[in-house]
Amino acid sequence: MKKILLLFICIFWSTIFQAQSLKLEEIMKGNDFIGNLPENERWSLDGSTIYFDWNPNKEWGNLTYYWKKGMKAPQKASKEEARFSKIRFVEKEGSGIYYYIDKGQLYSYAIKDKKSKKLFQHSVPVSNLQIGKEEGVVYFKQSDNLFKFDTKLGSLVQLTNFKKGKSEEKQKEKESFLKEQQKELFQFVRDQEQKEKWNTANDDAKSDFPKPYFFGKNSIESTKASPKGDFVTFRLREEAEVKQEEMELFITADGYNKFRDTKTKVSTNNFVNTKMGIYNVAKDTVYMVNFSSLSHIQDVPDYFKLYEKNKNLDKKDKLIVAQAPIYNQDGSYAIVEIRSQDNKDRWLVNLNLATGSFKEIEHQHDEAWIGGPGIPSYAFSSGTLGFLADNETIYFQSEITGYSHLYTYNLRTNKKVQLTQGNWEVRGVVLSKDKKTFYLTTNTTHPGNREWYKMNVSDAILQPILTNDGAHEVSLSPDEKTLLVRYSYKNKPWELYWATNKKGSSLNQITFSTTAAFQEYNWRSPEVITFKAQDGTPVNARLYTPNRNQANKAAVIFVHGAGYLQNAHNHWSTYHREYMFHNLLTDLGYTVLDIDYRGSDGYGRDVRTGIYRFMGGKDLSDQIDGKNFLVQNYGVDPNRVGIYGGSYGGFITLMGMLTTPKEFAAGAALRSVTDWAHYNHGYTGNILNFPETDPDAYKKSSPIYFANNLEGNLLMLHGMVDDNVEYKDVVRLSQRFIELGKKKWSLASFPVESHGFKETYSWVDEYGRILDLFNSTLLNK
């Protein structure tokens, strides 16, 4: 009996000590409490040195550090070395000569003697550096035009003569009575006209400078030369006249309020006409690519059938965006990736530069929206795409099986091959220098892991290299023998390691970033559990459970932000303050569940698109199913469950409190979207289509339409200079509550904070209010 009593006392005091050891004022310091973690890791060109950004001494910001094998600890790099390490270099394979742009000027760097040489300097900066097929030839962009620079000869040639506006050619004069009369009466006038025609026809001094091409009011972008420099492709984009949202700043240096443009709201008015053009250098001519023969380019989305106004629409081509071509080594193949602006289609085509015609290689369609790892999620973005060593086979990713996997397509034989398969995703693709081996980041062993595999193109067999639980962010050394690894686990923050590039490698730690204060606490490794949703779909979640003797039968459900994000994983969370807050809540006796609901990242296409046309549908029911799981398995009182989250998590909190008012006793909604018609175009248009074409999707997905249902205790918290989800969102919902006579709500405003809070005092105030809400509404019932 004495032993049992002694054990109870030890557990009691151990629990009390741990609960007292976490304080909001400390954990809300974020990385100042945890330790500032290394990031932006990179190799030197010769592979001898590792560079990364770090702040171990709590300075005002990150500085560049370096490390080499044999060093006991990383050292701070000089300012010049730090700057040089961040430059983007391009190399002609095997030449040992690298080219780069620094402050708008062109340089070369010889790996042999480690010396830089300035090649071109001009008052107008250069950009868009490309390597040509010929040795020593590079291309760059200056203003709107492309130039060819031969570093061996020192010659500079302007390839294009693109000009904004209309042609400067003299407008043809209208014939008039007086003009005709002058020619009729005076020989002098007739002679001058004939002389002008003769001079024009016999101008021996004709320039070989490219003729001007005027692109009007459009913008010109994605300008790119073919490897031989015989063609230049470009994209014209119509300038859309759309209204920008404005945000007011209240706390300013001079005491006067200021206004700032933030974003354009989702709308079909944001659709723009784009055209892909080709400039033929030898023929000095421009022609446009006609994509009207793309398969399914006139198909309308299925949801159109739900609206009477859409049933008899005239057929027309979808608006699309074509990316700059990806070339093989000699430029004999040019592959163009295309995405529709209605978000439903993606094409890959083989473009014939000489004729402007093309052959369609791949068409991908998703009735929700095109996306997933390695696949463009927005009209103006691009996905995984490149050539293998044979110069006739491309590789790309597709979600056709339900998970994003790697494929090849041979342009000569028209043979398509799936290289990877299974209920997991290819998260990242790196091709070796000889273009015969892939290095893949996947989540093969668990959706919440990030592993590193080697795969030879010839056999497509995955060879595991780094497969422990957690996340491995890997940078391959220039000689491909060593791995620079940024690794973390659920309760172990990101650190840098190195490993040999072979099976069974162990990680050798380079950085030690966490503070003594952080290390004093025994941080939980939350269990990643799976429960069944009401429709049978397995749903992953992080579970934090208190000691039995301390459990208070109350629970808090955390809803991560972004929607398409993963948080029930096996590595360190971007929500590190929330992770520490969940430890604090668990110390206080709460059970905490952090759910990867429908719409989350890491689980394939069906989960990714599970929120299509109804945000606040399955993503919310997953929270309720998670609550029921806790009630059935962990002794949680169904009347003592709270919910909170930020951004998308704040939106779900609002939908929970307003559309299922009996489910949650309290909710804290941070930086919440309250009306999706007021959010940005790219993100919202993917999921809900557009307010003009699919208004029903917006109405059933927006909390502001359900304000009358509020019953539980709602706390809203929002930064007043949020340029992502504007403060106006929560102001509009507040006005609805006021007009409807609702009482059980409050709003906390943070005058200097944006979407992601910066100041510790703001974090402390915000989470202090959240903790008070849960303690006052979920306990002592």
What spans do the regions from the language model cover?
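Serine-hydrolase catalytic core recognition
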Residues: 471-781
